[in-house]
Amino acid sequence: LATASGMSAMMLSLLTICSAGDHIVASSQLYGGSFNLLRLTLPRFGIETTFVKPRDVEGFKKAIKPNTKCIFGELIGNPGIEIMNLPEVSKIAKDAGIPVIIDGTFNTPYLCNLFDLGADIIVHSLTKWMAGHGTSMGGCIVEKGDFNWKQGSKFPTMTEPYEGYHGLSFAEEFGPAAFTMRARAEGMRDFGPSMSPMNAFNILTGIETLSLRMDKHISNTAIMVDYLTNNDNVTWVNHPSLPDHPDHE
């Protein structure tokens, strides 16, 4: 589902399953806009968030409440590049019966398939690496399509009849695609964060060279890390490729 920006993709993904009185568990290492949406804006609408350090797997488990609707995070935290233990966090979410929503902007699908690591829903800011040329803004939501939304009364926006579409139940009508269809039918309609045609064209053009650009980003980064690590004027270097980084393994 293409959106006007990465933030609109994140907002739609959360508001599709969250209502006033609900709760989110989120990594504390997030893009600033994401952090403030969770910390300052959503509480005005009755949606609260508990933040957990991305390496604290047990902390994610302890933070889950009966009204928790999802776990949100970034695999590679922005800006501290702490790595979230997504496979373990995903197991915790599965045991709790809630989806894991991951912002995949930093790694792009070229470098990492987040679904293989346990994500249920992925959001991207296409503005950055995916488009690649600083010409257009955009975002997207990608649903894996195998989450069970029919868990009693846990997800009423998925299971209960929706008056906005003649009493339709999205889980019954669309099955594995229920989340995407609800986000499209309600969120896109009511909030209007549609991607413009020109931005869509520019982003698709940019994605054609994604593999070439990401390979170059990685090789350039390796050169920079090596240079800085061996420079006597540099006190410390923080990068997961270094053996002494806490998330190197």
Feature annotation, model-predicted:
Residues S241-E249:
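Active-site loop ensemble at the mouth of alpha/beta enzyme cores that anchors a bound cofactor
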Residues N233:
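Hard-cation-handling environments
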Residues L1-N230, N238:
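Conserved PLP-enzyme active-site core in the AAT-like
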